[in-house]
Amino acid sequence: MYNIIFLGPPGSGKGTQAHLISTKYGISNISAGEILKHALSVTKFHFNFNTDNMLNQINSGNLVDDELIIPLIIKRIRQDDCKKGFILDGFPRTIGQAIAIEQNKIAIDFVIEFNISDSAIINRIVGRQVHIKSGRTYHIKFNPPKLDGIDDITGEKLVIRADDNAQVILQRLNQYRKYTIFLSDYYQKQSQQGNMRYFIINGNQEITKIYKELINIFNFHIFKMN
C-alpha cells in the first residue's frame, strides 16, 4: 500500500498524472475538487452551508471551509478501494489539512510537488476538459480524448469547468501562493525526518516525460521500501 499526495497549483498537470499513475499501480485516484462538487450537487447530502455560495467559492478559486472538505476526504480514504493505496489530488491545501490527515492516522508515503510557470498553467487550463464522475482530465491540444468531447473510458460527455478561465485561474494561483505553498516547507521537513519521501517535478515538461520521471521515482523507492 502506497499513499501519495500530488501537490501543485491548478493546471500543473497533477490531475493528468494522478490518473496515469493510479492506473499504472492500481491505486485509487482521489480528486478533492470533484468529490466536493459532487457532494454539494447531490440532494441526499445535508450540510449546514449554502450550497450555491459554496459552489461559487469553488468556481472562483477560494478555499472551502475545513469543516466541509476534511470529513469528505477522510470518508473517501476510509473506503475499501483505498486500502491498496491512493493518490490525493487537490488536498491538502493548507498545513491544517495536512495535520488533519495525520490526526486521522493516515500515513503518507510520497509527496510530489509539481513546479510550473504561471504562463504554462494558463495555457494548459484554457481548453481543459473533465470527466466529472472520475476526475479524468483531458486537453483539446495537449492531451485530447480519442473522440472530441467524449471520455475515453466510459464514452460519457466531457465538460469544461466554469472556473477554467484566465481571471479565475489567476485568483486560484493567488490562493495557492497564499496558503498551499507553505506545504512545501512542511512536507520537506517531514521528509528530512524520514516520515515520507518528498520530490519536486518540473511541471513544464511534456506529459510523457513527467510520467516517466514519476515511474522512475516510484519504482526505485517502492523497490527499496520492499
Curated annotation (Swiss-Prot):
Where do the annotations place AMP binding? 62-64, 90-93, 97, 161, 172
Which CDD domains does this entry report, sorted A to Z?
Answer: ADK (cd01428)
Might you report a single GO cellular component term?
cytoplasm
EC code = 2.7.4.3
Major location category of this protein:
cytoplasm
Its top-level enzyme class, in one word, is: transferase
Q: Quick one: which residues bind ATP? A: 11-16, 128, 137-138, 205
Q: What is known of its domains?
A: Consists of three domains, a large central CORE domain and two small peripheral domains, NMPbind and LID, which undergo movements during catalysis. The LID domain closes over the site of phosphoryl transfer upon ATP binding. Assembling and dissambling the active center during each catalytic cycle provides an effective means to prevent ATP hydrolysis.
NCBIfam families per the record? Answer: adk (TIGR01351)
Q: Which PANTHER family match?
A: NUCLEOTIDE KINASE
Protein family membership = Belongs to the adenylate kinase family.
| Name this protein carries in UniProt | Adenylate kinase
Q: What is the lineage of its organism?
A: Bacteria, Pseudomonadati, Pseudomonadota, Gammaproteobacteria, Enterobacterales
